[in-house]
Regions:
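Bacterial Sec-dependent N-terminal signal peptides
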Residues: 1-28
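Polar/charged side chains located within well-ordered beta-strands of beta-rich proteins
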Residues: 8, 15, 91-92, 148-150, ...
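Early exported N-terminus immediately downstream of N-terminal targeting peptides
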Residues: 25-99
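Hydrophobic, Leu/Ile/Phe/Ala-enriched alpha-helical segments that form helix-helix packing faces
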Residues: 39-43, 111, 115-119, 178
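Long, charged/polar, surface-exposed segments that mediate recognition or autoinhibition
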Residues: 84-129
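Acidic, glycine-rich flexible loop segments
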Residues: 120-145
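A short, solvent-exposed beta-edge/loop patch
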Residues: 137-171
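Short, low-complexity, Pro/Ser/Thr/Gly-rich segments in the mature regions of secreted, periplasmic
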Residues: 169-183
Length: 183
């Protein structure tokens, strides 16, 4: 009897050890997970984000959604639509500096002059240009960031979203998943 108890305990220990070893293996973090870590660090540091042109309220909303998911024990994975419920509209920027703000100011010019010569803003190429029902949507992007500019034919009424740390491809996956991006 004693032998069976010892054997059972040994088997349980081996099984538990195997499970622990498998769960301890590091897995590659998705692009969205890395982005959300940056969000958490930035929000914890300050109310002002010092490395991206993006509203504090948007960061806080993203972080709130992320924490809700963790609390609900939903597994975080590559499905970006689970982290981003919607793209918020922005009219102001938290700027890293006057030079960066000037670049964005050029991009927001009411005559869209930046489209005539160089179709690039802040190192991001023009990826999509659409005009529908009087709303002009312009999307710039690269492998690191996305800039969305919406204009509803009123030079003073811009909706702008800049997302640092999320590629254009990952950002556009939101649209494919049926989520309304607001443009």
């Amino acid at each position: 009897m004693k032998r069976y108890i010892v054997l059972t305990l040994m088997l349980l220990t081996l099984h538990a050890g195997t499970l622990l070893a498998q769960s301890a293996q590091p897995r590659e973090k998705s692009e969205v997970e890395v982005f959300m870590q940056q969000v958490a660090k930035a929000v914890a540091k300050s109310n002002e984000i010092d490395y991206a042109y993006i509203s504090t309220s948007m960061f806080k909303q993203l972080l709130s959604q992320f924490l809700t998911m963790v609390n609900d024990s939903i597994e975080i994975h590559d499905q970006v639509e689970q982290i981003f419920g919607s793209a918020m509209y922005m009219r102001r920027f938290i700027s890293t500096g006057i030079e960066g703000y000037k670049v964005l100011e050029v991009a927001m010019h009411p005559f869209w002059g930046f489209l005539e010569e160089k179709e690039e803003v802040m190192g991001m190429e023009l990826c999509a240009l659409n005009r529908e029902n009087g709303v002009v949507s312009i999307i710039y992007g690269n492998s690191d960031s996305v800039l969305v500019i919406n204009n509803n034919s009123n030079a003073l009424n811009y909706n702008i979203v800049f997302v640092a740390g999320l590629s254009y491809e990952a950002f556009m996956e939101l649209d494919k998943s049926g989520i309304d991006l607001g443009f």
